[in-house]
């Protein structure tokens, strides 16, 4: 977008309204990659990166408290940090490249991290093939989409792709999610931000069963890959919960609780893919 505005020659490349109109989050000059790259060999590069993260959060409230700001720590080798920046800077990105390139790179690394983590990686990442199958089945073309255990946001990203592939308007899709793990919640926020997707993930990470952040939500579509067979979900503290319309879930297994939670939040004519 920046390069396109420069080519127009009207001087609007630093007008943040031009970016916000297309749901592109604004990055101040001192937080842009060109600034970081130009200072890669400076001994204060860690502080420059931390300052850049602070600026981005300040200009984009949806990312407040999400970005890591610990690059100035003494234990981080600033020479190697600079070398990493130089290495990344060798990647050639051109103006007419794929719109979703950064998002695809982010998704690739999420998949790699999940692979390394093994079974534990499933807590924040569902394979793209599985997500695509679920989305293609329930067809979230427009309406409210909800994932009560959203992980890194794969269901939302694939829903956006579905809308685009069917010539729909992404603004007709409202995204709601909740995530218990603090780090994973941040991963999801960043994943959606770099794709320009607005979402209501609640003001913080939290337990879906014990602190439902979307109590009144009735979703048109629910997409989820819940962590099955959780035994210590605290069910004995929720025996009178309004969500258990079809019986109290067993205290030693959360599977039935997940199903009832989703049924409770589903609109009368809604669809769910689990």
Where do the language-model regions lie?
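Short acidic (Asp/Glu) and glycine-rich catalytic loops that position anionic groups and cofactors
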Residues: 85, 198-204, 237-242, 270-274
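Conserved S-adenosyl-L-methionine
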Residues: 120-224, 229-233, 240
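Conserved Class I SAM-dependent methyltransferase catalytic core
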Residues: 134, 185, 250-274
